[in-house]
């Protein structure tokens, strides 16, 4: 089993753990339709930045 050579101080321990938190997914609302989608992704109805970019089954 590995044994530490030097004790990690509380400050260094905190710095090590500083990135362990969970991040929320960045959501955006399409201004034209009001659909919620991931930022920089096409909304479920085929719109990106207010323009229709792909055809969907409903079209």
Swiss-Prot record:
User: What are the boundaries of the region Disordered?
Assistant: 1-40
Keyword Ribonucleoprotein applies: yes
Keywords from the named record: Ribonucleoprotein, Ribosomal protein
An example of a GO molecular function for this protein is: structural constituent of ribosome
State the source organism's domain of life: Bacteria
InterPro entries, alphabetically?
Ribosomal_bL32, Ribosomal_bL32_bact, Ribosomal_zn-bd
Q: Which Pfam families match?
A: Ribosomal_L32p
Listed under GO cellular component are:
large ribosomal subunit
tRNA-binding among keywords: no
What biological processes does GO assign it? translation
> Which family does the entry's similarity section mention?
Belongs to the bacterial ribosomal protein bL32 family.
The record's section on NCBIfam families has: rpmF_bact
Q: What is this protein called?
A: Large ribosomal subunit protein bL32
Source species, please?
Nitrosospira multiformis (strain ATCC 25196 / NCIMB 11849 / C 71)
